[in-house]
Amino acid sequence: LDSKTNAPIEFATVRIMNVGSLGSTTDSLGRFRIDNVPVGRCNIQTSYVGYNTNIFNEIPVTSSKEVYMEIPLDENVHSLAEVVIQPEIKKDKPLNAMAITGGRMISMEEAGRFANGFDDPARLSSAFAGVAGDVGTNAVAIRGNSPQFTQWRLEGVEIPNPTHFADLTGLGGGFLSALSTQVIGNSDFYNGAFPSEYSNALSGIFDMQIRNGNNQKYEHTFQLGILGIDLASEGPISRKNGSSYILNYRFSTTSLATGNDMNLKYQDLSFKLNFPTRKAGTFSIWGIGLIDRYKPEAIDRDEWETQGDRQSGNTAFDKAAGGLTHKYLINADTYIRSSLAATYSKDRTRADQMTEDDKLVHVGDIRNSKWDIVFNSYLN
């Protein structure tokens, strides 16, 4: 795809580096397919006349799942007596062409390899200059600013912090990201000097994108770990029209592992439906939702040392965001993208305290809810 207009590029060459002549060329819709790729990690190089060569490093290839990629190419416009083209890797260059400085692309493959990262883009960003992370949560302080002033965006729309148990132990941070690496594509992170399209942020910006599903083959993934169960599925809705779906559901297993009710319980669901058309552009329906529950209990009276030891309660967080996005190519150099979305967040905390005579007294009940309807449109 052209990185600025998102127009498909025909006859671009895509090859697997260091594997002989294994490669392919794109068709009129910019699609390509490479079979018989060796299992492991590979580097993919894409080139076309008039465009800078693009290289994606360390792409994991397994025997159980196809790799679906969207590769943007930057147009190379120069008037020179001699043209020498050399491939160049720029991980510090964001996907947004309007970002001159202060931005960096976050690869979900990088997030998966980051030590103690939990596949979390926020924890990955703590490795960048000017960003300080926290050991217990994914809160990040960017250039000394509070984590609560960090903005999260999904598919171009500002959303509530998509983190499980956000703001429970500290403002701006949480336990685990609800954005699974199974569905999130390459995204942008800004630690300053935001492009003019961004606002309402004093610290940093995470501009996340949900990738399109595989429009040729059905694929399903099941993962089981200490933190939870992860189910993912993607595939074509119509192979003829190129439409696809992708979804991911996670359910916590922490309470099952320990057998008590004091543990954190969470669920999250994210999805995207993509419907390209011949003349009306591309329509996408996307959404994300998460449910968090925490129920602490008072400890034995003989072990009381602080007020918190004698308190019990129930904390609930509910968040959701979803929308409809339309992208239309006006000509070879211009496209318009419009989105209509809604966001919702609700939290409630109830606290009870055990008295000296073993009576449970209600001491607090905090409720907060917020919803927004957002419409944006821009011409590029």
How would you describe each model-predicted region?
Residues 173-177, 185-195, 204-235, 245-264:
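Short strand-turn segments of transmembrane beta-barrel domains in outer membranes
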Residues 225-251, 261-293, 313-342:
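Transmembrane beta-barrel wall of Gram-negative outer-membrane proteins
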Residues 257-262, 290, 295-304, 325, ...:
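Outer-membrane beta-barrel translocator domains and adjoining extracellular loop/strand segments
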Residues 52, 58-63, 68, 84-194, ...:
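Periplasmic N-terminal accessory/gating domains of Gram-negative outer-membrane beta-barrel systems
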Residues 31, 68, 139, 186, ...:
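Membrane-embedded beta-strand positions in outer-membrane beta-barrel channels/transporters
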Residues 1-84, 88-90:
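Periplasm-facing N-terminal accessory domains of Gram-negative outer-membrane beta-barrel systems
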Residues 217-219, 257-261, 305-312, 321-325, ...:
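Extracellular loop and loop/strand-boundary signature of outer-membrane beta-barrel proteins
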Residues 133-134, 198, 223-225, 261-265, ...:
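Short sequence motifs at beta-strands and strand-loop junctions characteristic
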